[in-house]
């Protein structure tokens, strides 16, 4: 098809199709969040500073607007700033946030959140966690314990474990994806800070090396600037201005 692609638009279309084929491999790649009939539990992981807590806040707003009952859990208990930031998002979008005393056991805060979510017929429970990659063993133990606690209340949860990655960090994002997928099973990626400069070509590398789909994409500062990932639109964005 490339021989016929003399015009830039035709060439761009062929390349986009190729990139989408490459990304979706056998066309079998689920980019959608797996919402459940009852409670959907979403666990968010990722290093500090990649927009993880902000993404949770924006998603809370989005899901609430869709008519879902949303609750947040602040399980990054060792960073006072993280708890305060999530609590502030809760106030801003008017959804409840479950917190514990400072430096309390994250798993116990998660347990409280799970119990409350069941009691209050919540549709979507989103859990913010610590991102201390420099101490992998501790983080792994913490996330494993959180996972066990979640399963004790809802055996098939968490339904999504989403890794937040900053698109502008390039190769570093791939390294983080590798590290986190060793620590905990990751079902999808929230790609943040996609704007003019950060094209996020790293999603192709992550797809190729780790087989983890991007499920959500954050593309700006405003509260509405987050949404589902569509590979074709994304590949088109990667090529904007290049051809």
Task: Spell out what each predicted region is.
Residues 52, 76, 128, 166, ...:
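Acidic active-site catalytic centers that drive phospho-/nucleotidyl reactions
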Residues 1-75, 82-102, 109-118, 122-127:
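Primarily NTPase-proximal linker/entry elements flanking Walker-type ATP/GTP-binding cores
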């Amino acid at each position: 098809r490339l021989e016929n692609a003399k015009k830039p638009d035709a060439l761009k279309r062929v390349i986009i199709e190729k990139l989408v084929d490459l990304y979706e491999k056998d066309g079998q790649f689920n980019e959608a969040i797996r919402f459940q009939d009852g409670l959907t539990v979403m666990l968010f992981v990722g290093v500090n500073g990649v927009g993880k807590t902000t993404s949770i806040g924006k998603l809370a707003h989005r899901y609430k607007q869709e008519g879902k009952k949303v609750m947040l859990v602040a399980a990054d208990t060792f960073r006072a700033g993280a708890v305060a930031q999530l609590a502030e998002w809760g106030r801003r979008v008017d959804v409840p946030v479950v917190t514990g005393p400072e430096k309390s056991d994250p798993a116990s805060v998660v347990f409280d959140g799970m119990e409350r979510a069941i009691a209050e017929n919540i549709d979507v429970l989103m859990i913010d966690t610590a991102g201390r990659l420099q101490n992998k063993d501790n983080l792994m133990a913490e996330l494993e314990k959180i996972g066990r606690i979640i399963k004790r209340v809802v055996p098939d949860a968490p339904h999504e474990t989403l890794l937040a990655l900053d698109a502008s960090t390039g190769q570093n994002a791939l390294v983080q994806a590798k590290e986190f997928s060793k620590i905990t099973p990751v079902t999808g990626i929230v790609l943040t800070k996609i704007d003019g400069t950060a094209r996020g070509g790293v999603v192709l590398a992550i797809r190729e090396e780790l087989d983890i789909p991007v499920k959500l994409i954050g593309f700006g500062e405003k509260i509405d600037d987050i949404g589902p990932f569509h590979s074709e639109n994304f590949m088109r964005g990667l090529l904007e201005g290049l051809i």
